[in-house]
Curated annotation (Swiss-Prot):
2-[(2R,5Z)-2-carboxy-4-methylthiazol-5(2H)-ylidene]ethyl phosphate binds at residues 163-165, 192, 212-213. This is Thiamine-phosphate synthase. Gene3D superfamilies: Aldolase class I. Its EC number is 2.5.1.3. It comes from Xylella fastidiosa (strain 9a5c). Its cofactor is Mg(2+). 4-amino-2-methyl-5-(diphosphooxymethyl)pyrimidine binds at residues 65-69, 97, 136, 166. PANTHER family: THIAMINE-PHOSPHATE PYROPHOSPHORYLASE, THIAMINE-PHOSPHATE SYNTHASE. GO terms for biological process: thiamine biosynthetic process; thiamine diphosphate biosynthetic process. HAMAP family: TMP_synthase. It catalyses: 2-[(2R,5Z)-2-carboxy-4-methylthiazol-5(2H)-ylidene]ethyl phosphate + 4-amino-2-methyl-5-(diphosphooxymethyl)pyrimidine + 2 H(+) = thiamine phosphate + CO2 + diphosphate; 2-(2-carboxy-4-methylthiazol-5-yl)ethyl phosphate + 4-amino-2-methyl-5-(diphosphooxymethyl)pyrimidine + 2 H(+) = thiamine phosphate + CO2 + diphosphate; 4-methyl-5-(2-phosphooxyethyl)-thiazole + 4-amino-2-methyl-5-(diphosphooxymethyl)pyrimidine + H(+) = thiamine phosphate + diphosphate.
Length: 234
């Protein structure tokens, strides 16, 4: 094993497998009631620009998810590692979208799984008891229940409004959130969310709002983030 430093923390790297084992301080138990903005990165091919766009936003969010549907494996690894170093400096957990192998390799704090990705139980076994594992559940309560049984830390519902980024045939409603208060894990709302339309979503019980373009594509992303936060009274 050899030791490398990411941010101000040590991590152990297995020379044979290349798998990173985070220092225990890096993976903490999921906060009991996370509430606020769950920021998801855009499809950005310039790593330096991605970091520059993301850094000013970290102090105002709960979690960061790395998502880039256009990048190849090498670029995804480069960007994920750069974001992880940034997140280590601020204490914000970094999750990887749809790539359990990448999450494990770089020692990310968790992974978000879609419909055709790995089972949450596999992710839990590979990433450990404190990893944050999320599952897209669209508008399906039964899928959410099964995901939680399999080890999911949170479930995502959406889309709530039309979205250019998150295109699915599924449409979720505030009523769905009211029907899932018993699930016992945070519920993430996603899809076309803006500061002007999120009040009903928050009132219905969503603990977290997943946002991409509403913040990154705004004229002033920091101001946009504050507008979202104001709806949570945070």
């Amino acid at each position: 094993m050899e030791v490398s430093r990411i941010g101000s923390f040590q991590e152990h790297i297995d020379k044979t497998t290349g798998i990173v084992t985070p220092h225990p301080l890096l993976r903490k138990p999921l906060m009991s009631q996370p509430r606020g903005i769950y920021l998801i990165t855009p499809d950005e091919t310039d790593t330096a620009r991605l970091i520059a766009r993301t850094a000013p936003l970290l102090n105002g969010i709960v979690w960061l998810q790395y998502r880039n549907k256009l990048a190849n494996t090498a670029l995804r690894t480069e960007q994920a590692q750069a974001l992880l170093a940034l997140c280590r400096q601020t204490g914000i957990p970094l999750l990887i979208n749809d790539d359990l192998e990448l999450a494990q390799t770089i020692g990310a704090d968790g992974v978000h799984l879609g419909m055709h990705d790995s089972n949450p139980s596999i992710a839990r076994a590979q990433l450990g008891p404190h990893a944050i594992i999320g599952v897209s559940c669209y508008n399906q309560i039964e899928r959410a229940k099964q995901a939680i049984k399999a080890g999911a830390s949170y479930v995502g519902f959406g889309t709530f409004y039309p979205s250019h980024t998150k295109t699915t045939p599924y449409r979720a409603t505030p009523e769905l959130l009211r029907q899932t208060t018993h699930l016992g894990v945070p519920r993430v709302a996603i899809g076309g969310l803006t500061p002007k339309n999120i009040a009903p979503i928050i009132e219905a019980g969503a603990e977290l709002l997943a946002v991409i373009s509403g913040i990154y594509s705004a004229k002033n992303p920091v101001t946009a983030l504050k507008a979202y936060q104001s709806q949570f009274n945070i």
